[in-house]
Structures are given as C-alpha cells and as structure tokens.
Design a protein with these regions (language model features):
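Minor-groove-contacting beta-hairpin "wing" of winged helix-turn-helix DNA-binding domains
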Residues: 38-41
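Short, small/polar residue-rich loop motifs at catalytic or cofactor-binding pockets
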Residues: 107-110
Length: 133
C-alpha cells in the first residue's frame, strides 16, 4: 500500500478569525463552524483541509507548543488572472490581514503576492503572468 496525502492540518489560535480568512480565499467552510474546536473542509481533488484550536492539539499532545521563529508552512492559492491576485491581495490587506509581499511580476512567470493569515503564516496568491499565458 502506498500512503497518500489526504489532509492538510492547521493549528490556529483564533478559529473564527482563521475561518473568516480562508473563506475569503474561496474555501467552502461550514458557516456554523466558527466556535468549533475542529473544522474540516473538502478541497478539489479529494484532499481535505482541517483547522484545530491549540487546545485541541494540547488535548492529545500535552507537550505541543506553538512554533517560534520563522514559519515553515505556506499555502498557495492559484488565482484566475494577475488582476485577481491584485484584487484579492487588496481585499485581504484592506480587511486588516498583513501583507508580506505586495503583488509583483515574478521572474518565474507569475503574478505573485503573499499575505499573512491570522496566525502569521504566509499564504501565496499567484496566477500565470499575462506574458506567460
């Protein structure tokens, strides 16, 4: 048997803020989930994403502590166009989420930006640049 990636799990400090952020990115998160300690949503292709509060993680791993220093996890969202990268970046930063890299035309042929989620983790927004289309 070959293992297969089935779920991406995120540990969050504020469930409602995290779910609101990822809803803005188009994830279909249940509307009544904001006060739940564990939430899952289906992703295209059968993959799942899950959010757990810090308390949930500590309930089965009492030694768990939040990471310090640089965050090593990043999620990347493919946008339909370079204009959508710019618009989504403006929407998220306008809603108070910190921008890490303003939209720019990356040398690898993408319009690319990074905004931080409520726990300070980078979320990339990208689309093939107009020249690469």
């Amino acid at each position: 048997m070959t293992p297969r990636l089935d779920m991406i799990g995120l540990v969050v400090s504020d469930m409602a803020a995290s779910l609101a952020f990822y809803r803005r990115l188009g994830l279909d998160v249940p509307a009544d989930a904001d006060s739940q300690p564990h939430v899952e949503a289906a992703l295209p292709g059968g993959l799942r994403i899950a959010w757990d509060t810090e308390d949930v993680v500590r309930s089965f791993d009492p030694s768990w502590t939040p990471p310090t220093g640089g965050v090593r996890r990043e999620l990347a969202f493919l946008c339909d166009s370079p204009a959508e990268v710019d618009a989504l970046y403006a929407e998220l930063t306008g809603a108070g989420h910190p921008g890490h890299l303003k939209p720019w035309d990356a040398f690898w042929g993408q319009r690319y930006a990074v905004v931080l989620d409520p726990d300070g983790c980078g979320v990339s927004l990208f689309a093939p640049s107009d020249a690469a289309r």
